[in-house]
A protein has these predicted regions:
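Start-transfer (signal-anchor) and selected internal transmembrane alpha helices
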Residues: 1-21, 86, 108-121, 211-213
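Transmembrane-helix signature of polytopic, membrane-embedded enzymes
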Residues: 8-9, 91-129, 164-171
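Transmembrane-helix motifs of polytopic, lipid-linked glycan transferases
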Residues: 12, 78-108, 152-156
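Membrane-interface alpha helices of multi-pass inner-membrane proteins
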Residues: 41-44, 124, 172-185
Length: 213
């Protein structure tokens, strides 16, 4: 069986299982706490508590406008459902790359493909069913969308690490910088990835010396 096909099947499976899980358990209307504020701010495109979340409100507004059925609160909650489903897909992609790095080689045989990709799927689904992650994936809060930016940045960091010796590798760093800036329109959490990015670039491209550090 083709290794790329196995990889794609498992990746799609991770996304589908996550999406179905959260779609079946999403809050049917407006949840408690800040969710009500974000739901109201989304519908009327107003400003929630500082520092605000303009990008989240605009994306959630699209769900409110274009989902043809359901309670307005439910529509906005679906923003987090889609965000968390894509996070689980990225967790799968990140995990199998970590395993390949530990192996010191790419997957070569069908047996290795099933072992590596299957293990990555288990890891992704374990994260999918964890309590805190699940809790944030079924309500109109910014955390799911913020975590999506973090997961995407980590994935791009791994892609850059793979391509760091090839021409054009800077495009990954530029995209990461853009996403970090964009993510501040959702939550400030993604700024923490800057420290990991700096360490990655340093250890990948420079000799480890007290002066250079």
């Amino acid at each position: 069986m083709d290794k790329k096909l196995i990889n794609r099947i498992f990746a799609i499976l991770a996304f589908v299982v996550s999406f179905i899980t959260y779609a079946l358990t999403v809050q049917p209307s407006v949840p408690f706490w800040d969710c009500g504020e974000f739901s109201g701010a989304t519908v009327w495109q107003q400003v929630p508590h500082p520092p605000g979340a303009p990008l989240f409100l605009m994306v959630a507004k699209l769900f409110h406008l274009f989902l043809p059925f359901g309670d307005p609160g439910w529509k906005i909650n679906m923003t987090s459902v889609f965000a968390d489903a894509f996070i689980i897909l990225l967790v799968y992609l990140i995990t199998y790359r970590i395993i390949e790095n530990l192996m010191g080689k790419k997957v070569e045989t069908t047996y290795e493909a099933i072992s590596v990709y299957g293990s990555s799927l288990v890891a992704a689904l374990a994260f999918n069913f964890s309590d805190t992650f699940w809790f944030n994936g079924v309500e109109s809060e910014v955390y799911a969308s913020s975590n999506l930016f973090v997961a995407l940045i980590i994935y791009l960091m791994m892609r850059w690490n793979e391509e760091a010796d090839n021409p054009g590798h800077e495009k990954y760093l530029l995209l990461i910088a853009y996403l970090i800036g964009l993510s501040t329109g959702v939550h400030l959490l993604s700024i923490l990835t800057i420290f990991s990015l700096v360490y990655l670039v340093y250890f990948r491209k420079y000799q480890i010396k007290p002066v250079s550090f």
